[in-house]
Amino acid sequence: MEPVPLQDFVSGLDPTSLPRVLRVCSGVYFEGSVYELFGNECCLSTGDLIKVTHVQLQKVVCEYPETGQTLELNPNFTGLFSPLTSLRSYRTLEDLVSAMPQNSTRWPIYFKSTQRIVTKASVVPEDQPLRLEAVEIHHGIRYARCVQVSKTKELLHLPLSQKGPFWRCKPSAPQTLHQILQDPALKDLTLSCPSLPWNSVILKPQYMLQAIMHMRSSIVKIPSTLEVEVEDVTASSQHIHFFKPLRLSEVLAGGGPFPLTTEILEVPEGPPVFLSPWVSFLRKGQRLCIYGPASPSWRVVASSKSRKVPRYFMLSGAYQGKLKRRPREFSTAYDLLGALQPGRPLRVVATKDCDGNEEENPDFSFLAVGDRLEVLRSGQVCGTKGQDIDVLVCQRLSEQSGEEEEDLEEIEDEAEDKEQILLPLYLSGSFVEEVNDSRRYNLVDLTAQYSLPCEVKVVTKDTRHPTDPLASFPGLRLEEKLTEPFLVVSLDSQPEMCFEIPPRWLDLTVVEAEGQPAQVARPLSIAPVEELSEAFYYSLRKLPASESQAPPPRPPKSQGINKKQQNIQSCKESSVKPQVVEPQKSCPQPQLKAKTLEALPKNKSNVYSKISVHKKDRKPNPQTQNSVLSMKPKTSSSLGKHSTMESHLLPDPDMDDHDYEEI
């Protein structure tokens, strides 16, 4: 093979033929010159051997032949290109036909126009390929019989006086940027693309070569625009041994043999993944011993619960510390629904007063500090404007202790007096889970029995990990469980420093080193807890495996003050004759959707009679019980009763709208 410029060699290279061995023949360089290429040094001298292992398209330069102007395109450019047979454009169809040779082989002629062609029958868009099949005469006027090169194959008769400009093109469908670059027949051809500002362009791709040098273990990145001539000597250099760089992901996929002694060639750039001491040893030239895949392959991401700056950890499935469950905290009713599991009761206590937005639906309940609830299921009700509102159906529990309440449920479950209430999913509040569990779990049992996230406290350290930091925190939040393969690795110079590396997030480039590892047997002690950097933690939480549920529904827009006062005044006027007025006209009452809420007996007594005096008064909501417990539409008598009761609840217009607490 004759020496060729590096750019020409790469442009005609078949990626499937890699790797290729090149010899540097000549180039523009001085004695001892060094090309700094993306952090890798490469001194190219005459006679150097380069083994090209990978070629990546960096960008494509488009050149306008008429003016020499250039434009850079990204490799993901989505425009379509069509090859042109010449650089000449034709003003009319007659000029195009006249330029063709006068023989039978000139038909058909493929062409296109850079302007729209408007006819009585249709409109031909710009850059639409056309096939000119023949010239016909109708009523003394010469027409070109053309067919659109498309699915419709519409037949057109265009007069030869039709103005363009027109361009001849090859009979092929438009192709993408990668298709054009991969076709050797289209190399250096003039192309047209509707997405570009010029009628014709020439593509000049630029590549980045990844290669290794003979007698050097470093990886070299060489741009194809480097002014150097090379010669392909792959066939005559089979006996020459090159170092073979590997990524940890390739070592993991290869499956061994293990242990494998390697030397680090390159460490990926970017923010740190782990904050462990062994990270500082991962640098170029460091020798590692790889023992194979870690077991088990699943991990748990956790964050500390403390008033100070939170810290983030990744726990191995082999973690042997003992954990106790802690009460979970919820800030919305939507979070309560997400934590509800089939077959597992969820009981919470309200830690602040919550208003259920009775203006949107009178059935929404008011919660006071200390209210105990049991989450039952989700449901739907109709709002005042007729829209569907997602709700959480809960059961208000009495103030008895959990053990006494369980005994009552076993003895007289049906007779116990409990009230069902509705909470809109958008309700913002503060709830704490009731936990009566003193068991000590290991990580395997805890993740098998309870869904994550989960609040825990590490009560016993992992005895194999003396520096276990998790026991020092008052609480730990187990965020999610991930399944990711890790490699067990140790420093060749310090076999006792053993750790696990995830190739997906820390894909080191290594080369197999000569010699046996200092420790052949698999290490027994591996740190089961690794601290994560804050940047990596948040990037990890964005992975598809950790995508959370859809955000909670937004609360309805609040009405203006004037509109509220008008509604109050209209309700007051309508309450003069409660037995006659129709509530839907002045204060429309929403109806529960029977398909989502179960029917219960109607003769339930009010649970407020059981509330102790020292508790804060709740807002009375006489319709909640009837609406929740009844599945049938309200009768006229019930509507009248509601109007009568509501008339007593209307505020006095002379009084302030605020509710002041008496001191």
From Swiss-Prot:
Post-translational modification: Phosphorylation at Tyr-660 is induced by LPS. Phosphorylated by Src kinases (Lck or Fyn) following BCR engagement.
Keywords attached to this entry: Cytoplasm, Immunity, Inflammatory response, Nucleus, Phosphoprotein
Cell compartments where the protein resides: Nucleus; Cytoplasm
Location of Phosphotyrosine modifications: 660
InterPro entries documented for this protein: CABIT_dom, THEMIS
Residue ranges of the region described as CABIT 2: 238-515
GO CC entries: cytoplasm; nucleus
Main subcellular localisation: nucleus
Residues forming coiled coils: none
Consequence of gene loss (knockout): Homozygous knockout mice for Themis2 are viable and produced at the expected ratio. Mice show normal B cell development, activation, or Ab responses.
Region ranges (Disordered): 545-663
Source superkingdom: Eukaryota
One Pfam family per UniProt: CABIT
Stretches with biased composition (Acidic residues): 653-663
CABIT 1 as annotated region, ranges: 2-237
Polar residues: bias regions: 559-577, 621-641
Induction: Up-regulated by pro-inflammatory stimuli, such as IFNG (at protein level). Down-regulated by anti-inflammatory stimuli, such as TGFB1 and dexamethasone (at protein level).
Modified sites of kind Phosphothreonine: 596
Function (record text): May constitute a control point in macrophage inflammatory response, promoting LPS-induced TLR4-mediated TNF production. Determines the threshold for activation of B cells by low-affinity and low-avidity ligands via PLCG2 activation and its downstream pathways.
Assembly, per entry: Interacts with VAV1. Interacts with LAT. Interacts constitutively with GRB2, LYN and PLCG2; these interactions increase the activation of PLCG2 and its downstream pathways following B cell receptor stimulation.
Name this polypeptide is given: Protein THEMIS2
Native organism: Mus musculus (Mouse)
Record gene name: Themis2
